[in-house]
Amino acid sequence: PFFKWYHRIYQVLMFFIFLGPIRLILLIISFIICCTITISIVAILKTLKCDLNKYRHMIIAHARFWLRIFLFCLGIGWIHVEGEFDEDARFMICNHIGLLDPIIMIQIRYLSFVIKKEFSEIPIIHDMIDVCDPIYVERSKPCGYTNKIISQAEDKSKDQIMIFPEGTVCNGNYMLKFHRSAFLTNYKVQPIV
């Protein structure tokens, strides 16, 4: 059916009066609960001197539930996956077109991310990211972190490594220069779109 202009205004008005605030409140609550419980579990495991690597997937599985609500509140209702993941690939590469890319990838797969070192200085975000066993890289140093990435790729007990080879968020209209770290190994690299 064709909607007239005043129907559209009514829809927008009702969204801002009713649905918008509810989604915003749910978004904030889901993020706070996710952070609180995840950080609490990690703190308890560290206090008990437990190996965090043994419980990493359990913690991420718990966080997925709350992050799924978070994504739903942002309007991401379904994540469609086509094709198969190559279990032999140690690296996955993807263009970084939005700030939600890592959260969406965590919903699909257990991954370890290559992340800029600045994120290790943000208190709550740092604690949440550490659950994924990230590799922090310093952009000011052009080399040196490649060895860390390769050594983590060689450890088959660890999760596959997700790299955004452009190293930053871009709009997807053009390609930036790729960092070579994932391509310097003999391991398979799986592209993700």
PLM region spans:
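Generic structural "secondary-structure junction" signal
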Residues: 21, 121, 139, 171, ...
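Hydrophobic alpha-helical transmembrane segments of integral membrane proteins
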Residues: 12-49
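Eukaryotic beta-rich interaction modules
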Residues: 7, 15-23, 60-61, 71-80, ...
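Conserved Motif II region of HX4D acyltransferases
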Residues: 88-93, 113, 148-193
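Catalytic core of membrane glycerolipid acyltransferases/transacylases, capturing the structured
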Residues: 35-65, 71-74, 84-143
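Extended, low-complexity, polar regulatory segments
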Residues: 1-6
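Eukaryotic intrinsically disordered and solvent-exposed regulatory patches
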Residues: 77-80, 98-101, 122, 147-151, ...
